[in-house]
Design a protein with these regions (language model features):
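N-terminal accessory targeting/assembly segments
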Residues: 1-114
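Residue-level signature of catalytic and energy-coupling elements of molecular machines
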Residues: 47, 121, 206
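P-loop NTP-binding catalytic core
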Residues: 89, 97-166
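Hydrophobic anchor at the beta1->P-loop junction of P-loop NTPases
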Residues: 169-171
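The conserved Walker
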Residues: 175
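Conserved lysine of the Walker
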Residues: 179
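Hydrophobic positions on the alpha1 helix immediately C-terminal to the Walker A/P-loop
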Residues: 182, 186
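P-loop NTPase switch/communication element
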Residues: 191-233
Length: 233
């Protein structure tokens, strides 16, 4: 993903690697479009593919359509139309050509991939005994790009301790305001220990892989050195 000269972002080797990992999830056509856009992975929040609909991205809380040459537009008619082949190839890349290995996660309508990115899917659902048995003929893919904001909990941490004891804490906000991001950083700081607070053993029950973003059982997000995660339970 390139940047125009109007921005002076410093792209580290680590960031370049993250961008390459993200691009590898997509079909060749969409990968090319994303490479040509002037958005960095840090800007992107979601990349949405729907069969027959224009390619759509969410960046900095704004929706944009992407044209075939990677330009951002607010006019949906100019957006690149996602084809069934784009969907099929993208799912092949997401599942490393072994989607059967992700059947349990796919039944929930999402899976987590390397890097902590979460992939939501929609298609034909087969119900058995009031539970989803499988999802096939996938026609919609939503990639939620993983982001960490280390230090975002710095200002609240002093209020979460009393007499050397961590207090019961409830985080409340409107949707999309960063509750999970804040919680992840709180967990990291409790686990690592941040002066004057000692590091503590932390157990995380990550029902939808939103906090640790586990891939093959390993947390892709930094949740601290003393943290154990129960994923997808």
């Amino acid at each position: 993903m390139k940047r125009t000269g109007r921005q002076k972002d410093i792209v580290t080797p680590e960031k370049k690697q993250e961008q390459r990992e993200l691009l590898r999830l997509f079909s060749a056509n969409i990968r090319k479009i994303l490479k040509n856009t002037d958005l960095l992975a840090d800007d992107l929040q979601e990349i949405r593919l729907r069969t027959g609909a224009p390619l759509l991205v969410v960046a900095k809380d704004q929706e944009y359509f992407l044209t075939p040459d990677g330009a951002l537009t607010g006019e949906w008619e100019k957006g690149y139309p996602v084809s069934p082949t784009d969907i099929r190839d993208t799912m092949d890349y997401i599942g490393s050509f072994s989607l059967y290995a992700y059947e349990d996660e796919l039944r929930q309508g999402f899976l987590t991939v390397e890097g902590g990115h979460r992939i939501g899917i929609a298609g034909k659902t087969v119900i058995e005994g009031e539970k989803v048995k499988s999802i096939s003929h996938i026609s919609c893919i939503n990639v939620r790009v993983a982001h960490e904001k280390k230090g975002c909990a710095d200002r609240v941490m002093p209020y979460l301790w009393e007499d050397g004891r961590f207090l019961h804490t409830l985080i409340v906000s409107a949707p999309g305001c960063g509750k999970t991001t804040m919680l992840r950083d709180i967990i990291r700081q409790i686990s690592d220990g941040e002066s004057p607070y000692p590091g503590l053993t932390v157990g995380v029950v990550d029902e939808r892989s939103e906090i640790a973003g586990c891939y093959l059982g390993v947390a892709q997000n930094d949740v601290g050195i003393r943290t154990d995660v129960l994923d997808c339970c």
